[in-house]
């Protein structure tokens, strides 16, 4: 089963400017993500960027770059441009790996691609079981519920499903497992263009969750439990220091 990994790497970041080029153990962050994707067994790994500085860094370590428009409103629009520019066939599987996850486990990149290939959905993603009670009620931790066949029923920043009896108690203990969505997606390449040509849905605008557009228009998203929980991504200088510390310990 062949698949291509696309890694969006925007230079601009309000909380951490120049994030893709941030040094981690002597390598830019984007190179860490690229190397993890290569270990997953991808046929091709493409860095999608709108900045020449990122492009130059990628070329220096031997990676492949696709220059994209700086005007995209979403990561999926950037993917659509890559698919068009690189003439990727409609039935080919694309895995979108975030450029700020330098420690993403290769096994889950492969897993989400395999899951899509084995399903009849146009899109697949992964989730992990929530273990922290704080996370259950944190709107930044996106929850997902799936049906018995593993297809998403809904994604929400709210606590779903709401465990009525247990959450009525003062300690609100986690008795029944809840699933937190993790932001890795696999798509059939032709579906990406279909997606970006749909008008945004009311639900995705309310929740600020792009994936709800797929469910709104009646398509399916396959969801499975990740074989390995990914480390946190890098959004802030504090996150970057935490990842540097992890890498230094492994060295």
From Swiss-Prot:
Any coiled-coil regions, as ranges: none
Signal peptide: none
GO molecular function: 3-deoxy-manno-octulosonate cytidylyltransferase activity
Location in the cell: Cytoplasm
Pathway as given in its UniProt record: Nucleotide-sugar biosynthesis; CMP-3-deoxy-D-manno-octulosonate biosynthesis; CMP-3-deoxy-D-manno-octulosonate from 3-deoxy-D-manno-octulosonate and CTP: step 1/1; Bacterial outer membrane biogenesis; lipopolysaccharide biosynthesis
Enzyme class: transferase
GO cellular component, one term: cytosol
Protein name in UniProt: 3-deoxy-manno-octulosonate cytidylyltransferase
């Amino acid at each position: 089963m062949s698949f291509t990994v696309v890694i969006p790497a925007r230079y601009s970041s309000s909380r951490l400017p120049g994030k893709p080029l941030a040094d981690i153990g002597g390598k830019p962050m984007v190179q860490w993500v690229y190397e993890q994707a290569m270990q997953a067994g991808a046929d091709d790994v493409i860095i999608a960027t709108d900045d020449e500085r990122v492009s130059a860094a990628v070329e220096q370590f031997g990676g492949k770059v696709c220059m994209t428009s700086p005007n995209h409103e979403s990561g999926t629009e950037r993917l659509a441009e890559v698919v068009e520019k690189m003439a990727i066939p409609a039935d080919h599987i694309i895995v979108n790996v975030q450029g700020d996850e330098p420690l993403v486990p290769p096994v889950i990149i492969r897993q989400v691609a395999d899951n899509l290939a084995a399903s009849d959905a146009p899109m697949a993603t992964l989730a992990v079981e929530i273990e922290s009670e704080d996370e259950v009620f944190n709107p930044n931790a996106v929850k997902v519920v799936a049906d018995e066949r593993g297809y998403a029923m809904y994604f929400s920043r709210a606590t779903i499903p709401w465990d009525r009896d247990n959450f009525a108690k003062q300690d609100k203990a986690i008795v029944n497992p809840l699933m937190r969505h993790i932001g890795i997606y696999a798509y059939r390449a032709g579906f990406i263009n279909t997606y970006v040509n749909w008008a945004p849905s009311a639900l995705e605008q309310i929740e600020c969750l792009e994936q709800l557009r797929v469910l709104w228009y009646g398509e399916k998203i396959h969801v499975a439990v990740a074989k390995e929980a990914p480390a946190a991504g890098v959004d802030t200088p504090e996150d970057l220091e935490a990842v540097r510390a992890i890498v230094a310990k492994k060295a």
